[in-house]
Amino acid sequence: MMKTAVMFILVVVISLTYSSEEQEVARTYCGRHLANILAYVCFGVEKRGGAQYAPYWQETYLRSRKEPGVVDECCFRPCKLEVLKSYCGV
């Protein structure tokens, strides 16, 4: 009886953990909010003044890309954090 209860609890905990990981909601990020979330995702900090990130943002902004950019993927339509992470260090 005890083994059955422990197995049941274990199955419930594992299924709750798995379902919470799968339910990341795609959101839209535009303007300052997009800049802040990118700074947080890429550098692990909240962006305040932005001066310390100027070279990064200028380089990213000035680089011409033929494929869709972060604004296309995360402002014009919802995206998940994994998509934002793919723009770190670009």
Swiss-Prot record:
Propeptide residues according to the Swiss-Prot or TrEMBL record: 49-64
A GO CC annotation given for this chain: extracellular space
Family matches, as SMART domains: IlGF (SM00078)
Matching Pfam families: Insulin (PF00049)
Gene3D superfamilies reported for this sequence: Insulin-like
Record carries keyword rRNA-binding: no
A GO biological-process term: positive regulation of cell population proliferation
PROSITE patterns for this protein: INSULIN
UniProt GO MF annotations: growth factor activity; hormone activity; insulin-like growth factor receptor binding
Alphabetical keyword list: Cleavage on pair of basic residues, Disulfide bond, Hormone, Secreted, Signal
Disulfide bonds: C30-C75, C42-C88, C74-C79
Signal peptide: 1-20
Top-level lineage group: Eukaryota
UniProt subcellular location: Secreted
Further remarks about this protein from its record: Silk worm has two kinds of PTTH: 4K-PTTH and 22K-PTTH; there are many forms of 4K-PTTH.
Biological function: Brain peptide responsible for activation of prothoracic glands to produce ecdysone in insects.
PANTHER family, per the entry: INSULIN-LIKE GROWTH FACTOR I (PTHR46845:SF1)
Subunit and interaction comment: Heterodimer of a B chain and an A chain linked by two disulfide bonds.
Family statement: Belongs to the insulin family.
Name this polypeptide is given: Bombyxin B-9
Classification lineage: Eukaryota, Metazoa, Ecdysozoa, Arthropoda, Hexapoda
